[in-house]
Amino acid sequence: VNAGPGRVGAAPVALVATTAEVLAHPELDEGLLAPWERHRLAGIRVPARRDDVVAARLLLRLCASRVTGLPPRAVEPAQRCPGCGRDGHGRPYLPDHPGLGASFSHADGLAAAVVGPGPVGIDVEPLTRRPGPVPVLRRLLPHDEVDAACAEPEPGPALLRLWVRREALFKAGRDDVPLTAWTDRRRAAVVALAAADGATGATGVGGACRGAGTDGATGAGRADRGAGADRAAGALVPALSLGPAPWPSRSPAPPSGR
């Protein structure tokens, strides 16, 4: 199945939600997952973590659906590890849509995904998480960016913003992709999005479209300031509305969410 002409040139679509919101969405259910994905889920022993993984994979399908115009069940993501060359893990991609990039993330009751032309990457972390001891971060991240974050009035949140930005760029596979970071206060989440074109960003669903630059219960989020050069808040286009009403709700080491 291929998207119609012009679809691949569409703006990226990025979605962020709680795991409960995703699992309650009427278009999404675990039956959409491929057999190889369900096989991998069988190895996850912690129910909450399993739900997070399911939610992220379903959200990726919803993003792909919004970009291609196909129903979520017609989208079949795959994964391939660039290191070992084996399938089933590593960077996600859409075999039937080679012009589109894909990325997802999950962490402690949160899920995020993005699909769009060219390289894309997304990362989400709980607002209260701290990425780890500074000496460890200096081994993983550019020293000058870590030092700049440490010089902020609140180093913990600044280091978390730095971490999610770098994770988003890592997932995109390039350091020169435009980067946007914002805080979703309603879901107590920090999000970073790397996308080659201006993304249609959405935090959750429901209600009328809200413009960028908001920092409340339903907005797309404000652009965070701090270490690293992000696009201004105005670069976020209005949030995508997926329905007439909101979705029903149903470390010493670096963050583990992916």
Where in this protein do the model-derived segments appear?
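Core catalytic alpha/beta fold that binds nucleotide/phospho-ligands
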Residues: 1-210, 215-258
